[in-house]
Amino acid sequence: MQDDFIKVPNSEKTLTPGKLFYNWFAANIGIMGFVFGAMIVNYHLSFTQSMIAALIGALSFLAPGWVAMIGQREGITTFKLSRAAYGIYGNKIPNVIAWLNMVCWLAVNVITGTLLLVSLFNVIHVEKNTVTKAIALIFFGGLVICSGLLTENTLAKIQTWLSYIFGILTIVILILFLVKADWHAAFALPSGNWITGVLPAISIVAAGSGISWSMAAADWGAYVNPQTRPAATFWNTTLGGAVPMFVLMAGGILLSTIEPSLATTGDPFGVMYAALPSWIGVIYFLVAAGGLIPQCIISFRSARINLATIGIHVSQPTSLLIHGAIVILIPIYVLFISGNFLSNFEIFLNFLGICLASWVAIFLCDSIMFRRHGYNIQLVKQDSPVHYNFGGILSWILATTTGFLFTNNAIWNGPFAHGIFRNNSLGVFLSAVVAIFCMLIVKTFKRGRI
């Protein structure tokens, strides 16, 4: 869709609820769901607590479902809608962060996919070296870049097929994990603290799933057939992401009983491979690498939409070239120079999660409080008279800052990250709560629409 258009033309609104479901199902059926499950157990939780954390974390997809429903109702993509909550210029900072999030996720997934293809080559007795790594990067990165040439309808069809193929194969792998899991050890796990264990576990899962995907939700919802019931858009988006995420996290929780290093290792895919019989090695690496492609498709598409929404107006071929270069150059640095990329994965999720949790909380509060009867089209145009919506901006700054002040990790030590906030991701949860509280205050000073 061209940035000259605020609303998606009706001729392009071709997505059905089913296609929406498979789009999000495909994006969340990847092997990384097992790793999230192991990360939950790493917070020293019992089996019941871990399953509760996984369920609530997966239900963070209620946020993308809601955003997608707004996108369908208005026919407008995510960060164009966000202009109403922040103002045309005030929206640029969260918009840039969203673009950065998509680009970083894209780079991480391309790097991961490349390494998985290299591992696949090794399983079929092709020597691992610089050449095979380069071939794998060109192949995987090339697939992602080529997806930028396709229409939304074509991408939706591809996502549907990928859902079936990798969904079935992932279930096979899940069954093998469940058969091998130590169920007695799982049920014997001691209970952890509900505040310092369960809540941070929920926060880190939500940051890496529902909160992150909220930015792309209306980018797909805006293309849904206008005759579709809003509830269908909401539930197909929510369940499409939540169901596979929960099932895979449950598998990861059980897998951690036989592979306790899964949550902390620098090579989680290698650890999972070691837990499987050798005969399924080729299928496993195909599923692990192929399962990342749907995520890359969504990230690549939304990154290009967000770049245009920021105000950087380039032609479609130029946008494709810019993002294609990023997809290739960052992995080249990591794969051939730096040599390490997963060590700061949780830190990456935590930082972006704080910024995005407050953004989506304010976006949804603004929609409920001030846009219940629809958005004023003038507020989301590039020439909008409202340059800065200070209610939304100040709420976001205060909420995000509060989240950082109560967060600590290997590279940041917030001054108030003590007690229950020490060494966990409660800052993500706190930033969303503070954002909602701030918007309630804003509402008392506002009447009607902002």
Q: What are the language-model segments listed below?
A:
Residues 53-86, 95-103, 107-110, 440-447:
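Juxtamembrane transmembrane-helix boundary signature
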Residues 9, 13-17, 150-163, 212-247, ...:
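Hydrophobic, small-residue-rich membrane helices and short re-entrant helix-turn-helix hairpins
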Residues 56, 95, 123-150, 164-175, ...:
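Transmembrane alpha-helical segments of multi-pass small-molecule transport proteins
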Residues 1-47, 61, 197-204, 222-232, ...:
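Membrane-interface "cap" regions at the ends of multi-pass membrane proteins
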Residues 110, 115-118, 164-190, 206-211, ...:
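Hydrophobic alpha-helical segments and their helix-loop junctions in multi-pass secondary transporters
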Residues 38-69, 90-95, 241, 246, ...:
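Extracellular loop-to-transmembrane helix junctions
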Residues 39-43, 69, 85, 93, ...:
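Membrane-water interface regions at transmembrane-helix termini and the short interhelical loops
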Residues 7, 359-438, 445:
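C-terminal membrane-solvent junction of multi-pass transporters and transport-like membrane proteins
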